[in-house]
């Protein structure tokens, strides 16, 4: 069994699932997502490749469930080495003047409130030497991206604040930028797009892995 533990929130599809598979070669993966079937399919792929995973079919917007998960992780392993936060809600594109209130509320809950809840739960598990990873999305700007863009920017503001605060004491906070990928999230934004020129999530996960596992923090500690 791998000694290192990687917690991946948003692990059922897209980049989160691809990173779970890639990381399973060197880490025991804790895969968190709401979709049980997709998690089970991920587990099958990880087992087939010789890795190991623990599945946590949970909603990250449920703070009680997340607190229980983190207690369970501490009770079993005492710590984690890596947290990859890939969970995101991509609200439909809409003019700012007609944003649906329910879509915006869900975007806030998943992209902002859950992140703000998870950071203090997970920081003690990471300690000084762990690493947390967040994802930038430069395309989440401009017209019609109001709901997603605003909440994604708020999520990154939380990550950047934590990154600066932890610079001297740890953990290492990394904000990485994936290339455009052929994912369900992107398809919601660009339903008629020719996807042949987009990157495959597995290939992009492998590209990002070197940056994620690089022991050098994103900002040099002083």
Predicted regions and their residues:
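Rossmann-fold scaffold of SDR-type NAD(P)-dependent oxidoreductases
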Residues: 9, 80-88, 111, 134, ...
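Conserved glycine-rich cofactor-binding loop
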Residues: 12-13
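Conserved glycine-rich Rossmann-like NAD(P)H-binding loop of the short-chain dehydrogenase/reductase
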Residues: 26-41
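Catalytic Tyr-X3-Lys loop
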Residues: 97-116, 133, 155
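Catalytic loop of short-chain dehydrogenase/reductase
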Residues: 88-89, 124, 129-168, 177-180
